[in-house]
Amino acid sequence: MGIFAEAETWVAVAFVILMALFAYLGVHRTVLQALDNRRARIKAELDEARKLKDEAAKLLADYRARRAQAEREAEAIISSAKADAERIAAESKAKLEDFVARRTKTAESKIALAEAQAVADVRAAAAEAAVSAAATILSQSVKGQVADDLLGKGIQEVRSKLN
């Protein structure tokens, strides 16, 4: 029996014939083209993924920059509001102190005026009482024209000294 009786020989012959048939039909070109197409598709997907990653990184950087800017603006607004509030409080305090000082001065003026008026009223009442008492005493003790002249002169003198 020889070499042609062995199963391995026929497997090898079938393999060689199959490979020759594949070569004749151009199967290797179809397989290579399919592999090239797959490689190109994978490369395109990787390029697209890299492009998307770069865009995402730019968007993230832009977001962070905007957020930092917004935080700086918020801090500026807050510090400005605090400064305005402090300024308004200081102005209000100064206005209140000025108002209280003016009211105090006005009240003191009114009190001094009322006090002066009261003193003048008391002096006038005392002068009237003294004049009336002097007139009564003089009219009872001195009679006639001399009494009237003395009485008039005395009343005028008392009034001028007491007022």
Curated annotation (Swiss-Prot):
CDD domains: ATP-synt_Fo_b. GO terms for molecular function: proton-transporting ATP synthase activity, rotational mechanism; proton-transporting ATPase activity, rotational mechanism. Keywords: ATP synthesis, Cell inner membrane, Cell membrane, CF(0), Hydrogen ion transport, Ion transport, Membrane, Transmembrane, Transmembrane helix, Transport. It is a single-pass membrane protein. GO terms for cellular component: plasma membrane; proton-transporting ATP synthase complex. It comes from the Bacteria. The chain crosses the membrane at residues 7-27. Pfam families: ATP-synt_B. It is found in: Cell inner membrane. Belongs to the ATPase B chain family. F-type ATPases have 2 components, F(1) - the catalytic core - and F(0) - the membrane proton channel. F(1) has five subunits: alpha(3), beta(3), gamma(1), delta(1), epsilon(1). F(0) has three main subunits: a(1), b(2) and c(10-14). The alpha and beta chains form an alternating ring which encloses part of the gamma chain. F(1) is attached to F(0) by a central stalk formed by the gamma and epsilon chains, while a peripheral stalk is formed by the delta and b chains. F(1)F(0) ATP synthase produces ATP from ADP in the presence of a proton or sodium gradient. F-type ATPases consist of two structural domains, F(1) containing the extramembraneous catalytic core and F(0) containing the membrane proton channel, linked together by a central stalk and a peripheral stalk. During catalysis, ATP synthesis in the catalytic domain of F(1) is coupled via a rotary mechanism of the central stalk subunits to proton translocation. Component of the F(0) channel, it forms part of the peripheral stalk, linking F(1) to F(0). HAMAP family: ATP_synth_b_bprime (MF_01398). PANTHER family: ATP SYNTHASE SUBUNIT B (PTHR33445:SF1), ATP SYNTHASE SUBUNIT B', CHLOROPLASTIC (PTHR33445). This is ATP synthase subunit b 1. The lineage of its organism: Bacteria, Pseudomonadati, Pseudomonadota, Alphaproteobacteria, Hyphomicrobiales. The gene is atpF1.
